[in-house]
Amino acid sequence: MSRARAISLSLVIAVAVVLAVPVGGQNAAGDPAAVAFMRQINQVLRGSSLHIAVEQVEFFTVGQGRPANRIHQGGIRWVANDPRRFADGEKITYLVDKSDGATASGLTSAQTEAAIDSALGTWQASPPMKKVTIVKRADGGDDPDIFDSFFGFGGFGNPFLADIVEAGWLPRAFFEAVGGPGGGRGILAFSVSFIFTDDDGNPTDINGDNYLDTALNEVYYNDTFGNAATDRANNPWRINLPLPAIDVETVALHENGHSLGLGHFGPPPAAVMNPVYAGIRHAPLPTDAAGMSALWSSWPK
């Protein structure tokens, strides 16, 4: 039995307490309500043997009344050869959860997976990532994510099947729960990053680079868009189609930029990592590349 499975029953009981604490409010950097809720989740995680904590959640939005900021508590980075994340040497691994890959707008799991693969391939091919090998791990059918379980939208899975997990398309209510009122209408997707903690629950920096150690990352996509029963029916998830459609690869490129360590920046709409969706963008711009270079330049060859 995996260490995640071994503690899942006790976590289910504890999660019920966490769910009684609403997110609410504007989830901007340092927002008291958002940070307090993250602390509630982290209290549950602290009672487990995983030695991880939620550190930041970063939204990609359509720019209509929703915060385009991150829930953010500190700088984090991946650590090469970190045995705690079952690291594949100096590689970064990712997994696409096929079970939630189809969309209400009619895309199949195979279509969305191919778009996500293309997005990760774009980052891999960018010059700043030349020292890094991004490896895809096969979906073996196990539940590979945990963040959704804190809101009642899935079981507590095994979070160490890959460094980055593409958790799939979830319903509007999940994004309302995470992003507060209006989140289900305005948030296209978000990336949630976990860090490692020591036996006392304190963040770790095992390589002394003055950044907290990234443990894992999960990406969630909003299935409201293109759902005929919602007010976002006219903004369907599509493959390589312009607005008002939402291009899967563009959103995946942005969110996996977060997964690899980038924050929101760049003059809108001229950067992949701008926080508001502005149509198809499949190639990083100089601001994106500069940020990625700063993150990965010290990665061992």
For each of these PLM feature ranges, what is it?
Residues 24-108, 183-212:
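Disordered inhibitory propeptide/activation segment of secreted metzincin zinc metalloprotease zymogens
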Residues 274-300:
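Post-HExxH zinc-binding segment in Zn-dependent metallohydrolases
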Residues 98-113, 234-243, 247, 275-282:
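Second-shell loop/turn segments in exported
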Residues 256-270:
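Catalytic Zn2+-binding segment of zinc metalloproteases
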Residues 10-18:
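Bacterial N-terminal signal peptides
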Residues 113-251:
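Metzincin-family zinc-dependent endopeptidase catalytic domain
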Residues 1-11:
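Bacterial N-terminal signal peptides that target proteins for export
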Residues 37, 41, 108, 112-119, ...:
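Stable alpha-helical elements in mature extracytoplasmic
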